[in-house]
Amino acid sequence: MDLWQLLLTVALAGSSDAFSGSEATPATLGRASESVQRVHPGLGTNSSGKPKFTKCRSPELETFSCHWTDGVHHGLKSPGSVQLFYIRRNTQEWTQEWKECPDYVSAGENSCYFNSSYTSIWIPYCIKLTNNGGMVDQKCFSVEEIVQPDPPIGLNWTLLNVSLTGIHADIQVRWEPPPNADVQKGWIVLEYELQYKEVNETQWKMMDPVLSTSVPVYSLRLDKEYEVRVRSRQRSSEKYGEFSEVLYVTLPQMSPFTCEEDFRFPWFLIIIFGIFGLTVMLFVFIFSKQQRIKMLILPPVPVPKIKGIDPDLLKEGKLEEVNTILAIQDSYKPEFYNDDSWVEFIELDIDDPDEKTEGSDTDRLLSNSHQKSLSVLAAKDDDSGRTSCYEPDILENDFNASDGCDGNSEVAQPQRLKGEADLLCLDQKNQNNSPYHDVSPAAQQPEVVLAEEDKPRPLLTGEIESTLQAAPSQLSNPNSLANIDFYAQVSDITPAGSVVLSPGQKNKAGNSQCDAHPEVVSLCQTNFIMDNAYFCEADAKKCIAVAPHVDVESRVEPSFNQEDIYITTESLTTTAERSGTAEDAPGSEMPVPDYTSIHLVQSPQGLVLNAATLPLPDKEFLSSCGYVSTDQLNKILP
């Protein structure tokens, strides 16, 4: 009879789905399975027809029960054919035999209940089902693994507060733990999970698990009705127990008017439109200021900007035209150093006494080994603290008349006088040995050597031919050559390009004087240390005693007091006057200027000399009450 009812139910369910024209859904199949289970409960749980364990649970960790499905054999039950046996897998009881279920009734049909006497925690259990003596299913577990508490009881809620708008409210939900769980003594620790939803909704909203028996629920609408349920689990387990009964929450209406939906400000749309507007403004600004922004980010490469020059000439590589334009302008001057004659100098170093052994000055200066190239360029750049001789504003006559730059050197004065005396003697010897009266002045090619005073300058040496025909006023008398020094010293170069020569010393008595006493001057000069400001009496007496003109032997030597260490001004003045009278020979010729200035440079080896005024006479020696200084001694000594 039951089989016919089952077949009829399945036929009715299939016919209803066929007539409705819709496909079978899981809900329809579920309703059909429920109908089948109501007609025959054992058919849906175990299709194989053999008994099988469904679950084992412990509600409070003190007792547990196991359930299984009953086997069906041709639709008839076999009473007492299914049995449950268990064994505790303890080392002490491992040798024991399987024991049968202690209680088949307390937990319901097809179940076995184990009370606290048969329950042991932390000890594994193994159970098995037998049907007519044969094992059909087996399972092993421990009690703490199968804990599933009973549902909480006594659910209720309390209104906490209502929003100012009268739309939302907050409630507090409370419940009681399962009555059979010993929670207060701490035998079992439970966690609770609350779920709620609106009555018409299908999706439950879950809250986080809590250990307390109360939890607040926020933002519930006053015009809605809610369902609330709670379930629990052991803290160390993941399996929840059954849900509690559903609690319905109906919030009171606080306003007589119907609650309207909350006005939600469209922040998202405002942000989107704001970003879009800012982007548009940025693009407009960039396009409007495109050139300026380009200049700031990528500045243009500067082009050559020279006044009066076309940049196309530089691009096309026409450098000759560019140089021509630059040469025309005042601010540009081509650096043709080889043609710049006023920076050329000639130097003769006569201060080194060691060079005397190498031959005469004439041989050394006229030899080709001492000639240097005209391409050597230099310029004096000296800041020694002394008065500079390079003063373009000073006239040539001032240089000839003044002795500031070439006669005030206290250290180099004796050496310069010695060199001039040697050169004078050499000049007179050459005049006697060479036919000056027979040879025309044009055939003479003297070498003009220019020397500095104290400090070296970058100079250019070379042979310069003197064109004497351009100066007939100076060389008209051949006898005047004896009174002209062979060498000249350049002291300055005027801005016009002329060379200014320093005034030299007058010729001395004659060839006999130079031949007889060449060593006297050197002896006097070597006896004095020119670095001292004053001089010893013995040295001065020796120098004055052997002074030139030895033929005047009857003159009276100056008397010096042996007790005085220094020479007084009065004694030296007297000696200078007596020696000066002996030097003045009645047959001496009229002195002529030793040096002159260069008027024109015709060629690298030709000079045109200017006539210069006679040098001023030596300054008088001013006697004073004191000792003799270096400058005064140089005036007195020959």
Swiss-Prot record:
Molecular function as annotated in GO: cytokine receptor activity; peptide hormone binding; proline-rich region binding
Q: How is it modified after translation?
A: The soluble form (GHBP) is produced by phorbol ester-promoted proteolytic cleavage at the cell surface (shedding) by ADAM17/TACE. Shedding is inhibited by growth hormone (GH) binding to the receptor probably due to a conformational change in GHR rendering the receptor inaccessible to ADAM17. On GH binding, phosphorylated on tyrosine residues in the cytoplasmic domain by JAK2.
Q: Which InterPro entries match?
A: FN3_dom, FN3_sf, GHBP, Growth/epo_recpt_lig-bind, Ig-like_fold, Long_hematopoietin_rcpt_CS
Q: Which residues are glycosylated?
A: N46, N115, N156, N161, N200
Extracellular-side stretches of the chain, per the record, are 19-264
Which Gene Ontology terms of cellular component type are present? endosome lumen; external side of plasma membrane; extracellular space; membrane; plasma membrane
* Chain segments carrying region Required for ADAM17-mediated proteolysis: 260-262
Cystine connections: C56-C66, C101-C112, C126-C140
Which family does the record claim for this protein? Belongs to the type I cytokine receptor family. Type 1 subfamily.
Checking PANTHER family in the record gives:
CYTOKINE RECEPTOR, INTERLEUKIN 5 RECEPTOR SUBUNIT ALPHA
State the name under which the record lists this protein: Growth hormone receptor
Q: In which organism is this protein found?
A: Oryctolagus cuniculus
